[in-house]
């Protein structure tokens, strides 16, 4: 049986070489939503006039005028439709009396059909017009149980009699077909030329109809002037992408935190954090939401047991509701969180058949715990929500109190913005505000992460964008440091959409032809290489360099053994992992790296922007040494201390066309432009110095040396935050490259910044007191490395550590009364430096080691600070409580009393200031 849209379309169009439509009937345009519906016939204006869909175990074919079901010129298609709809070959076909002549057309094609007033047993297929309003429930259940429904009609005449503003929800045919994502609209279908498509036609971006969703927005926001989400957790941003979905709560940048949608016969309201569903400040909105979801029904509201506070709020306002562990029958509205997809299908059917769903949750925490996985595809809430045209994004939104959006703000919609963007690219006008462009950049990139394979609603949009971007090739943004583009420009949107299209599986070789400077030339001669890596990793996920570069847009084939394919390895293309989606100006595309799971022995993968190739070995992997064959890549400059010969290095840097190269030891790997490496005749002295510094870093941190996982520093044309930032990898600007690879300069001038970031990577939450020490204790490593390895005293290592500067900071802090809120950065560092100057580095090293073995460490700053006071005092056998109190630390009486038995610290440097 044809169970996919592509196979279904092929079955429906078998032998249909032309559309012989009768001239008389005026059809209605069909609106398709959800993930199951797909077009079958589309006119030259892009209007869908015949569609098909799946629901439950059954199927539907929807025709935009009943006259099409009664015309012998469509006999071949009608025969195909009945055969495809049939749950089994030869299943009985019933025809409603209003379509009696259809039975004759089918019989003329060899299909026995009988006139039946209703879809009773043992019928497998039932044919009916869209005007019957007495069998809605029976028809839905007939399809849900596995039957096939052929239904035809137009809604424009009904709308003229009953009002266009009710057509989607009240037109009889929509009461049935909407459960499967197909709606008759009041818009006339143009009777133009009809091309027979070879594959599933595209679904239009927008379909206009008389029913205005702004009425729903007004009902949900009635009596509300502001939406206060400031106290109930950190929300995610929401993506509103369905044709019948709409925003309700927006911040000043159009980032959405409340949204709603119609779906089938039901409705959905989504909050970007479950805490919003119990916030007293949102009480009026929540009551509006439940009433809107109920659509005037008097049934019970079911509240999941995870939302007890919401249950209490609803009871207080007189609503009949009950706590339920899961969705139960008999409720008209169900309220739950978005953290489980066990009931995804049941919830979708509940809404499709008329239920109301109030749901809330965020995806940012899930994304942080599932690196490498797409929240749009895999987050449980999105498994439920995507088909409703709503999704929860892995990005946060600053909470606060926001005014109810203006009508203009609520007018923003992803599909509308994309339609205007398309018109702009086609030089057909287009009217996109700057804030719409900035929002479209984020929304478009997010939408393209929803898996599109086998889902016409998403695949159609992918096809549309591919076509637009291919037409745009000659003007593809040549973004670079010399030619940056604004974050709220059409060029930025193109960069984002092209990147995500390529990441979603689109062949990007054609797109890559229009790239500018941020790439390795595709005119190289890539070849096959076998590389050896050590796939034993006791530490966190580690990038293993291959020494290879993939040209932009090039498709590479990766081959590995069965054992490796089962080891959880990933392939990463590119090392510039900073996401620049929030940047106001772009010197490169926002996302230029790509990861994929290496779960097959042979795999094809590409990246629009090319990049160095890495194998990511997961923590705990014990695979050991292994070989990987990589085709169509080029060698990149790579020097490993103790392994690469000088001859091989010099040959590589002169010949390699790759734009980036790496210098590596067992403890640190530097990724810098090849152009900078060409001046480095012999990397060995430089890397030996780096290893000395890394050994010092490990020594102070009481960590093993060599490092369990080498640290990485990557230079980039643009990074996401600051001059440099810590992490894996540490990121820096190109201006910092010279200090990273200049041994002479490092020894004479030092390199405070890079070691500062390496220090950040050594900080541990057990003895960190954010935000006070975040930018302070990391500098202990900068001081230590400069003094013990580079021979540069602290007073010369950084201007802020000159004696006058230090003394002035102490006096200023004490003159203010030593407020803890001001104890940060250099002021906080001074406390630690005074301890080090009195007691040396050994107490620090010993404490860092001891903290690795401690349990039951407090989670709050006061608790952690008092533990540090006690531990450091015990380590040096001096009562340091007065010293820390002088700095404004909240030393508890109990701690001070316990330390009173220790000798007084007579040399306390703070005495002279008090």
Curated annotation (Swiss-Prot):
One of its GO terms (cellular component) is plasma membrane. InterPro entries: Class_I_gatase-like (IPR029062), M60-like_N (IPR035423), Pep_M60_3 (IPR042279), Peptidase_M60_dom (IPR031161), TCAF (IPR051244). Keywords: Cell membrane, Membrane, Transport. Interacts with TRPM8 (via N-terminus and C-terminus domains); the interaction inhibits TRPM8 channel activity. Interacts with TRPV6. This is TRPM8 channel-associated factor 2. SMART domains: M60-like. It is found in: Cell membrane. It comes from Bos taurus (Bovine). Residues 541-840 form the Peptidase M60 domain. It comes from the Eukaryota. GO terms for molecular function: transmembrane transporter binding. Belongs to the TCAF family. Negatively regulates the plasma membrane cation channel TRPM8 activity. Involved in the recruitment of TRPM8 to the cell surface. Promotes prostate cancer cell migration stimulation in a TRPM8-dependent manner. Pfam families: M60-like_N (PF17291), Peptidase_M60 (PF13402).
